[in-house]
């Protein structure tokens, strides 16, 4: 791969307003996993939105809401973990719209057959695939990343296999034989996804060091 081509690929990872989607967070939605990666609660604390790249995305979350009980009591309702997959290719904003969940009858119906809407900035529905994430492990705390990886490999209703692939061991990126050398065609997409993900995790100095390294790589 030519260094110039790699640099262009990396440049695509940088935040660009015209190619970003704003996911508006809801106080009644507890986001657990985003695109195969666990979401840190400290990262979301106080935030009302998340910036996403345009393209396919997958959210794993629970609905948490105080509901009315018979006799004027209240309790906290927590839904089973849900998986929502959708595409933001031509969408600049995503908003949650939950159904009415005011009492035990409504939450019981929601548990049995979850439904919700994702709306764009013009309040138009976004096509979404919704499913319940069945937890296979009894371990505590729940490894949501691992559960989502298994789900995405199982061809379920809201599965996105590309996010299961991204959970694979990335040790080869650090080995003597780089994935950047003689990449077979079927690995091109995976490699690009990994580059984008790890580049965005790095601090500005690390990004700059990587770009300098890329410029020095010989043409293949």
UniProtKB/Swiss-Prot annotation:
<feature type="signal peptide">
    <location>
        <begin position="1"/>
        <end position="20"/>
    </location>
</feature>
<keyword id="KW-0732">Signal</keyword>
<protein>
    <recommendedName>
        <fullName>UPF0319 protein YccT</fullName>
    </recommendedName>
</protein>
<comment type="similarity">
    <text>Belongs to the UPF0319 family.</text>
</comment>
<dbReference type="InterPro" id="IPR018635">
    <property type="entry name" value="UPF0319"/>
</dbReference>
<dbReference type="Pfam" id="PF09829">
    <property type="entry name" value="DUF2057"/>
</dbReference>
